[in-house]
């Protein structure tokens, strides 16, 4: 792992999405400014994603916006990349100035970070969402409400910026229009460009095994791999009832071949005659694995159902993605802290 990737690992942005029966597509752009960066880390980075796929990159070393997906390079002319390169060079300078201003306000020195996330989502029913927010040192700083054309500020420093930004009603309306119209238009265009990759479906391969995790404690693991898209719902049932509170979940991780893998586990009560089954839902297919009490042979039943759960973690780095399931009742966005 290179120095850049190692440094960016704490800069994960967690995106928690509600339990959903439909597939969601998203377009997200992340910008990261670093003051006094360590060796090998650019002072400014910008990356774009469609769903979990990196599509564009820019950093202060190359100072060029470049495609990260072949279907982006094939469908967008050279003048597109040059035009947005010039815009991002402007953003690079703006981030440098704003980060220095924030450090003065907070009386901070040394290495600090300033982040921006903007994007939109397109749901299967045609409805859309949009989001724009900033973070300082990995903590929420300013969050845009496009419905009220206002900013949510988290502290006194943010309130000072909020007042200045809200004085420019033209800019607020521009951001709202970009989130609701232009962002969605770009997302639809990119989905068409990369439809062979972005809109394909590969079903999960699922298996269950037992493992003695502690002396006298047996844990059942349900593992799914080889699936795409990464939206998947896994649960354990005991005697036909879901046991969410007793389960543990693994990360949803890229397998390196364009598919994903994950797992869910539950501790087995050796003194009971409970019947356990693992249920996996992915793109309308429901996989049920019944765990025999004595035998290691596990029958597999598949049937068509509707329903899936969407959960995402996006790393604001250069092409490195990690995914993790979050509690299904939560929704919103959380920035994990970055090192000082």
Swiss-Prot record:
Compartments reported by the entry: Cell membrane; Endoplasmic reticulum membrane; Golgi apparatus membrane; Early endosome membrane
Chain positions recorded as 5-(2-oxoethylideneamino)-6-(D-ribitylamino)uracil binding sites: 31, 46, 65, 116, 174-175
Biological-process GO terms, alphabetical: antigen processing and presentation of peptide antigen via MHC class I; innate immune response
Region spans: Alpha-2: 110-201
Region feature (Alpha-3): 202-293
Region of interest: Connecting peptide: 294-302
Main location: membrane
Cellular component GO terms held in the UniProt record: endoplasmic reticulum; external side of plasma membrane; extracellular space; MHC class I protein complex
Region of interest (Alpha-1), residue spans: 23-109
Top-level taxon of origin: Eukaryota
Binding-site residues, pyridoxal: 65
Modified how: N-glycosylated.
Positions annotated as glycosylated: 107
Residues binding 5-(2-oxopropylideneamino)-6-(D-ribitylamino)uracil, per UniProt: 31, 46, 65, 116, 174-175
Antigen-binding cleft, as annotated region: 23-201
InterPro entries: Ig-like_dom, Ig-like_dom_sf, Ig-like_fold, Ig/MHC_CS, Ig_C1-set, MHC_class-I_related, MHC_I-like_Ag-recog, MHC_I-like_Ag-recog_sf
Alphabetized UniProt keyword annotations: Cell membrane, Disulfide bond, Endoplasmic reticulum, Endosome, Glycoprotein, Golgi apparatus, Immunity, Immunoglobulin domain, Innate immunity, Membrane, MHC I, Signal, Transmembrane, Transmembrane helix
Bilayer-spanning residue ranges: 303-323
SS bond list: 120-183, 222-278
Amino acids binding 7-hydroxy-6-methyl-8-(1-D-ribityl)lumazine: 31, 46, 65, 116, 174-175
Signal peptide range in chain numbering: 1-22
SUPFAM superfamilies for the chain: Immunoglobulin, MHC antigen-recognition domain
Family listed: Belongs to the MHC class I family.
Subunit structure of this chain's protein: Heterotrimer that consists of MR1, B2M and metabolite antigen. Major classes of metabolite ligands presented by MR1 include riboflavin-related antigens, pyrimidines and ribityl lumazines, nucleobase adducts and folate derivatives. Forms reversible covalent Schiff base complexes with microbial pyrimidine-based metabolite, which serves as a molecular switch triggering complete folding, stable association with B2M and translocation of the ternary complex from endoplasmic reticulum to the plasma membrane. Alternatively, forms non-Schiff base complexes with ribityl lumazines.
Note on domains (UniProt): The alpha-1 domain is a structural part of antigen-binding cleft. The alpha-2 domain is a structural part of antigen-binding cleft.
Descriptive protein name: Major histocompatibility complex class I-related protein 1
Name of encoding gene: MR1
């Amino acid at each position: 792992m290179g120095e850049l990737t190692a440094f960016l690992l704490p800069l994960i942005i967690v995106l928690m999405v509600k339990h959903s029966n439909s597939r969601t597509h998203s377009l997200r752009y992340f910008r990261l400014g670093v003051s006094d960066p360590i060796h090998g880390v650019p002072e400014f980075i910008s990356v774009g994603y469609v769903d979990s796929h990196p599509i564009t990159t820019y950093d202060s070393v190359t100072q060029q916006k470049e495609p990260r997906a072949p279907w982006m390079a094939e469908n967008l002319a050279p003048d597109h990349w040059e035009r947005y390169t010039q815009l991002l060079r402007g953003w690079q300078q703006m981030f440098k100035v704003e980060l220095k201003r924030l450090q003065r306000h907070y009386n901070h020195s040394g290495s600090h970070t300033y982040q921006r996330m903007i994007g939109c989502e397109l749901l299967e029913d045609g409805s859309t969402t949009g989001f724009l927010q900033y973070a300082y040192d990995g903590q929420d700083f300013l969050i845009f409400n496009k419905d009220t054309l206002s900013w949510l500020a988290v502290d006194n420093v943010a309130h000072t910026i909020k007042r200045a930004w809200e004085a420019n009603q033209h800019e607020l309306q521009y951001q709202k229009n970009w989130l609701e119209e232009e962002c969605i238009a770009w997302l639809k265009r990119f989905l068409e460009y990369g439809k062979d990759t972005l809109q394909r479906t590969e079903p999960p391969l699922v298996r269950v095994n037992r493992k003695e995790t502690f002396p006298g404690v047996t844990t059942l693991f349900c593992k799914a791999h080889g699936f795409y898209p990464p939206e998947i719902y896994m649960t354990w049932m005991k005697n036909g009832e879901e046991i969410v509170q007793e389960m543990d979940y693994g990360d949803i991780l890229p397998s390196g071949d364009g598919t994903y893998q994950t797992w869910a586990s539950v501790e087995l009560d050796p003194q009971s005659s409970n019947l356990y089954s693992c249920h996996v839902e992915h793109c309308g297919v429901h996989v049920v694995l019944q765990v025999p009490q004595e035998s290691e042979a596990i029958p597999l039943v598949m049937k068509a159902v509707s329903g899936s759960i969407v959960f995402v973690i996006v790393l604001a780095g250069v092409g490195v993605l990690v995914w993790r399931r979050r509690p299904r009742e939560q929704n919103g966005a959380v920035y994990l802290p970055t090192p000082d």
